[in-house]
Amino acid sequence: MERTCLAVILAAGDSTRMKSSKSKVLHPVAGRPMIAHVVEAVASAGISSVALVVGRDAEEVAKAASIDGVGIESYLQKDRLGTGHAVLAARDAIAKGYDDILVTYGDVPLQTDAPLKAARQGLADGSDIVVIGFHSDRPTGYGRLLVKDGELIAIREEKDATDAERTVTWCNSGLMAINGRKALDLLSRIGNSNAKGEFYLTDLVEIARSLGGRVTAVDAPEIEMTGCNNRAELAVIERFWQERRRREMMLAGVTMIAPETVFLSYDTIIGQDALIEPNVVFGPGAVIDSGAVIHAFSHIEGAHVSEGATVGPFGRLRPGADLANGAKVGNFCEVKNGRIGEGAKVNHLTYIGDAVVGAGSNIGAGTITCNYDGVNKSETVIGENAFIGSNSSLVAPVTIGDGAYVGSGSVITADVPADALALGRARQEIKPERAKLLRERALAIKAAKRAKA
């Protein structure tokens, strides 16, 4: 029978060091609140449910933690009396009787499921407590994990450690797995006879051992256990997340010419043999199919780029943009809620918003779909194999038929039938010698101003 598991995520801190008007767990990593990364990690570890311990910004934190397929209940920690007290805020959830209890933190967004699964396996193998640790070249400030004969005998805080114990490099991450059938009994035994009068979760090690229980530890990469307390640490976490995800993509067949300049979102999907040039930013909701090319300095969010399509350089795709196979959106072009048909070209200095561009059509430089009247958005439909001349304005709602031509500089306010030529501009006039007269008049005005000065 599969073991049941409750994940208790502690996210009730005051976040004072973040210097922010909102809880630190709401700050994004790769375009997603860090608390959501934590929920995803515990979900991948096979948990049955999540108990989210909240304090500041409780409603916002609970909303940010919500991801599909994961049952979450929130529990308010009114007073901040230590980690042991925080876990007991979820007493009602723990009392439901799970095999395993995983305790983790909402400000550790780089954690993965591997050490969480290892901790759960430790419980399955007979441990009552499994602490997740990490080895560090700079252990100063961390509690040390002291192990003897394969069991964890103590977590020694820096200030209490002997000189010999300070040489230990295996450190306490704070993450822990607890035998769910014994959890409430163990947690209720934590006291607060310390200088701060707080209830420390780490006391469970000695409590469990004093009752004859087995306590062990498992290892995790140090970077995955990194907590986020300020903006500098947030930047470090963002950098590592990006490095890890870029490497995964490149090993899966994506070419990145200068990967350190490419920034991905938590849900970015890029297919095999796609080419990503330098200085490209992907916001949430970007899907890039196999063989697509994203040229330098492009920004893509909420958009789909099909096989063989190209974007940029300096292209921007906003939510709802959808490029069909072989479509091109070139330099200094923006597409928002627009479908660009197969082989269609939008090559220069163009805005396509709330529009459909048919297959094989060519949109000239400087073309604007005028989709907003100050109140409502309207749609522009351009048929297949149409040609829109440069510097044209298409005032929506309007339809340009298949094979139609729009002359350069036109302002189109009415539908254009298929294969028709539309001209929406004033007729050119030539006035001989008029430029000379205008120039002479301007020079005379200038001279008069100088004479008065």
From Swiss-Prot:
CDD domains, per this entry?
GT2_GlmU_N_bac (cd02540), LbH_GlmU_C (cd03353)
The residues that the entry says bind UDP-N-acetyl-alpha-D-glucosamine are 10-13, 24, 77, 82-83, 105-107, 143, 157, 172, 229, 318, 336, 351, 362
Q: What is its EC number?
A: 2.7.7.23, 2.3.1.157
Q: Segment N-acetyltransferase: which positions? A: 253-453
> Where is region (Linker) located?
232-252
Cofactor annotation = Mg(2+)
Q: Which family does it belong to?
A: In the N-terminal section; belongs to the N-acetylglucosamine-1-phosphate uridyltransferase family. In the C-terminal section; belongs to the transferase hexapeptide repeat family.
Q: Which sites are catalytic? A: 348
Chain positions recorded as acetyl-CoA binding sites: 365, 371-372, 390, 408, 425
Asked if the Swiss-Prot or TrEMBL record annotates the protein with the keyword Repeat, the reply is: yes
Keyword list, A-Z: Acyltransferase, Cell shape, Cell wall biogenesis/degradation, Cytoplasm, Magnesium, Metal-binding, Multifunctional enzyme, Nucleotidyltransferase, Peptidoglycan synthesis, Repeat, Transferase
* CC per GO annotation: cytoplasm; membrane
Please describe the quaternary structure of this protein. Answer: Homotrimer.
Q: What does this protein do?
A: Catalyzes the last two sequential reactions in the de novo biosynthetic pathway for UDP-N-acetylglucosamine (UDP-GlcNAc). The C-terminal domain catalyzes the transfer of acetyl group from acetyl coenzyme A to glucosamine-1-phosphate (GlcN-1-P) to produce N-acetylglucosamine-1-phosphate (GlcNAc-1-P), which is converted into UDP-GlcNAc by the transfer of uridine 5-monophosphate (from uridine 5-triphosphate), a reaction catalyzed by the N-terminal domain.
Membrane-spanning intervals of the chain: none
* Annotated region described as Pyrophosphorylase, given as residue ranges: 1-231
Q: Which residues bind Mg(2+)?
A: 107, 229
This chain belongs to the protein called: Bifunctional protein GlmU
Q: Which GO terms describe its molecular function?
A: glucosamine-1-phosphate N-acetyltransferase activity; magnesium ion binding; UDP-N-acetylglucosamine diphosphorylase activity
What does the note under cofactor report?
Answer: Binds 1 Mg(2+) ion per subunit.
Q: Which reaction does it catalyse?
A: alpha-D-glucosamine 1-phosphate + acetyl-CoA = N-acetyl-alpha-D-glucosamine 1-phosphate + CoA + H(+); N-acetyl-alpha-D-glucosamine 1-phosphate + UTP + H(+) = UDP-N-acetyl-alpha-D-glucosamine + diphosphate
Q: Provide the organism lineage as a comma list.
A: Bacteria, Pseudomonadati, Pseudomonadota, Alphaproteobacteria, Hyphomicrobiales
